[in-house]
């Protein structure tokens, strides 16, 4: 019985691979169904014999309560975008300045959702969304219902891989036809359909929707020496990789590939929105490293966005939290990239002057980065006798004089008590990526500000339930709920607070780097500018912005008030002692470990102060090698790098 079940699982998985991955089915649907029903009957009679890679795991559904947060062991970085050949050439120049011998690999940019798959001993244990790159959502049960995601691998390896989950065009058309017949709203585009499907709490729906994947990265330390070898390894392990890639000796080669793919784009069975260009050599990737947000060794070329004509009906001017005054055009509605667009950014006053944009003009509208509607240019042939657009001289919020500095393209309100700026700062402070105060959105901020209850972020922590009950729409329950959310936010780790302060140029990733290094905001407030600038991924711009902010009397007063309100100013993550055994060292983990899981070994190395890298380079200080270490160990030996084993790591 056990042998027959094993045979059926093996045969059915092979047939599924032929159908879903190779598009070369060797048996009829009827023959597959007969074998599948036999397997179901055997598993029903003998549930103790069900194998982890049985295809029956992919069908049927169960209702999930929700999705738990999942902290990625290996962060997922976003990519720097490029929209022209000139920007690609600038990327190439930056790479070749340090590595003139570098070559590239060009891969299609699939228009789907980034996912991470983690296997232990060859079994799928976690499937997660990208989230913010550090924390995503655990959607393992849903990803198990995606037909081409391997439930087990042919080798009992520990590995984390990255890729894209998408909805093929054929599946999209089928699903939308079904929704239309059922009287349900159709999905706007395949990407939205894939996103909605992966967020389903009913796993049975996921199984029916026909999602697919392309995997392209080994996130855990790799034995490969190039990105092309990574793709070959993923292929060998049973993952679906996209074979529409090319190796390029120069940026000219990459541009040739981009042009050829652009011509074939509509004929592909899936949506793409560009081409990703990566340095192929993993050692060079390691040397180039990362900025705060993105790798220096890759760039995502985005295809030109869809464009439509629309008329500018009027222009609104709004003030953001940094005082920048932004013009937004109100448009005659147009359908653009699957959505109705009636507003589009005009960027700034210099852009309006450069393009000579006027109210009443017919303009070309597109979605910048396929996300933000923007005005590209005026259609001159429709120009009538419109007047030059009036530019405001006073802030639309506080009526203060606006400034237009020579080195800036935007108008700016410099009034420190401008209501719009203050409210925007409060909204940002309460936002999910900052202090995450649930329920404190723009409408509530406006009410609090209008009632004179808050003027800066410290005032939020002075609010009482009675204060909230004075606001329109608040009852005892809602007031207590918001009050508790405010109190809960006091215990956030300090990087949330630092990001929430809205210091110019200091984003969420930079905030974490800073508080990890300095431990708390009071220490950071007195840090030397050069000490800040020297941190990996930061630099002088962020350092100057921070030191200028904390040097102000207002910032010192704000910190004092937050401390008095018992808001946590300390980093609550793992802090590494500067005297730790591996402090400041770059360590590569390679080979098969006998007693520790790879993520446990990585966590221990980091706790000891090490920066764990994915491949050996000149910057590597130490290699911890298990069995079957392969080429990584060989390269380390050639470079004279110190080698240690698992027993040594355990002894620390």
Swiss-Prot record:
Binding site for NAD(+): 29-33, 78-79, 107, 130, 164, 278, 302
GO cellular component terms given for this protein: cytosol
Record keywords, A-Z: DNA damage, DNA repair, DNA replication, Ligase, Magnesium, Manganese, Metal-binding, NAD, Zinc
Entries under Gene3D superfamilies matching the protein: 5' to 3' exonuclease, C-terminal subdomain, 6.20.10.30, BRCT domain, DNA ligase/mRNA capping enzyme, Helix hairpin bin, Nucleic acid-binding proteins
Transmembrane segments: none
Active site annotation, chain numbering: 109 (n6-amp-lysine intermediate)
Reactions accelerated catalytically: NAD(+) + (deoxyribonucleotide)n-3'-hydroxyl + 5'-phospho-(deoxyribonucleotide)m = (deoxyribonucleotide)n+m + AMP + beta-nicotinamide D-nucleotide
CDD domains assigned to the protein according to its UniProt record, in alphabetical order: BRCT_DNA_ligase_like (cd17748), LIGANc (cd00114)
Domain of life: Bacteria
GO molecular function: DNA binding; DNA ligase (NAD+) activity; metal ion binding
GO BP annotation list: DNA repair; DNA replication
Cofactor(s) needed by this chain: Mg(2+); Mn(2+)
EC numbers: 6.5.1.2
SMART domains per record: BRCT (SM00292), HhH1 (SM00278), LIGANc (SM00532)
InterPro entries: BRCT_dom, BRCT_dom_sf, DisA/LigA_HHH, DNA_ligase, DNA_ligase_AS, DNA_ligase_CS, DNAligase_adenylation, DNAligase_N
All residue ranges annotated as the BRCT domain in the record: 577-652
Binding of Zn(2+), residues: 395, 398, 413, 418
SUPFAM superfamilies, sorted: BRCT domain, DNA ligase/mRNA capping enzyme, catalytic domain, Nucleic acid-binding proteins, RuvA domain 2-like
Primary role: DNA ligase that catalyzes the formation of phosphodiester linkages between 5'-phosphoryl and 3'-hydroxyl groups in double-stranded DNA using NAD as a coenzyme and as the energy source for the reaction. It is essential for DNA replication and repair of damaged DNA.
UniProt record similarity statement: Belongs to the NAD-dependent DNA ligase family. LigA subfamily.
Protein name: DNA ligase
Originating species: Streptococcus suis (strain 05ZYH33)
């Amino acid at each position: 019985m056990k042998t027959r079940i094993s045979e059926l699982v093996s045969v059915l998985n092979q047939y599924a691979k032929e159908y879903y991955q190779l598009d070369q089915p060797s048996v009829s649907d009827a023959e597959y169904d007969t074998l599948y029903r036999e397997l179901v009957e055997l598993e029903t009679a003998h549930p103790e014999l069900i194998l982890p890679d049985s295809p029956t795991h992919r069908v049927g559904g169960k209702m999930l309560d929700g999705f738990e947060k999942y902290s990625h062991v290996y962060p997922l970085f976003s990519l720097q975008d490029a929209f022209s050949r000139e920007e690609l050439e600038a990327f190439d120049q930056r790479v070749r300045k340090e590595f003139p011998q570098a070559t590239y690999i060009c891969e299609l940019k699939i228009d789907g959702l980034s996912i991470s798959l983690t296997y232990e001993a060859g079994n799928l244990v976690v499937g997660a969304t990208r989230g913010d790159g550090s924390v995503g959502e655990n959607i393992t049960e849903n990803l198990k219902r995606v037909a081409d995601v391997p439930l087990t691998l042919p080798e009992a390896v520990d590995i984390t891989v990255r890729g894209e989950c998408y909805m093929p065009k054929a599946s999209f058309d089928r699903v939308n036809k079904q929704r239309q017949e059922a009287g349900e709203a159709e999905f706007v585009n395949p990407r939205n359909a894939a996103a909605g499907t992966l967020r389903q709490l009913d796993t049975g729906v996921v199984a029916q929707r026909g999602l697919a994947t392309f995997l392209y990265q080994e996130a855990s330390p790799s034995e490969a020496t190039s990105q092309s070898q990574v793709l070959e390894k993923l292929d060998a392990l049973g993952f679906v990789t996209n074979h529409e890639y090319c190796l390029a000796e120069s940026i000219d080669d990459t541009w040739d590939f981009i042009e050829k793919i652009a011509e074939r784009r509509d004929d592909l069975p899936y949506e793409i929105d560009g081409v990703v260009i990566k340095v192929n050599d993993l050692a060079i990737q390691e040397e180039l490293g990362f900025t705060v947000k993105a790798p220096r060794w890759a760039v995502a070329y985005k295809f030109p966005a869809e464009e439509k004509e629309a008329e500018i009906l009027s222009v609104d001017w709004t003030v953001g939290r940094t005082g920048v005054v932004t013009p937004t055009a109100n448009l005659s509605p147009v359908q653009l990239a699957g959505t109705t667009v009636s507003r589009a950014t005009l960027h700034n006053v210099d852009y309006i002057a450069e393009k000579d944009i006027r109210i009443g003009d017919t303009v070309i509208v597109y979605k910048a980065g396929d996300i933000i509607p923007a005005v590209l240019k005026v259609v001159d042939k429709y120009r009538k006798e419109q007047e030059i657009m009036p530019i405001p001289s006073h802030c639309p919020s506080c009526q203060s004089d606006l400034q237009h500095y020579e080195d800036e393209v935007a108008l700016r309100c410099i009034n420190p008590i401008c209501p719009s700026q203050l409210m925007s700062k409060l909204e940002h402070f309460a936002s999910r990526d900052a202090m995450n105060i649930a329920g404190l959105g723009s409408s509530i901020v406006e009410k609090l500000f209008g009632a004179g209850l808050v003027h800066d972020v410290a005032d939020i922590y002075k609010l009482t339930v009675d204060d909230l009950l004075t606001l329109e729409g608040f009852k005892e329950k809602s007031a207590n709920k918001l009050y508790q959310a405010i109190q809960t936010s006091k215990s956030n780790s300090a990087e949330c607070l630092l990001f929430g302060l809205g210091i110019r140029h200091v984003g969420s990733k930079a905030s974490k780097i800073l508080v990890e290094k300095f431990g708390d905001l009071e220490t950071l407030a007195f840090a030397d500018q050069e000490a800040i600038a020297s941190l990996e991924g930061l630099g002088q711009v962020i350092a100057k912005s921070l030191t200028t902010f904390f040097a102000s009397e207002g910032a010192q007063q704000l910190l004092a008030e937050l401390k008095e309100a018992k808001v946590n100013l300390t980093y609550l993550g793992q802090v590494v002692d500067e005297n730790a055994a591996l402090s400041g060292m770059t360590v590569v983990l390679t080979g098969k470990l006998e007693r520790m899981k790879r993520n446990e070994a990585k966590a221990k190395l980091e706790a000891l102060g090490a920066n764990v890298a994915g491949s050996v380079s000149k910057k590597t200080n130490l290699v911890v090698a298990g069995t079957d270490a392969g080429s990584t160990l060989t390269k380390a030996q050639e470079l004279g790098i110190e080698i240690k084993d698992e027993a040594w790591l355990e002894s620390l």
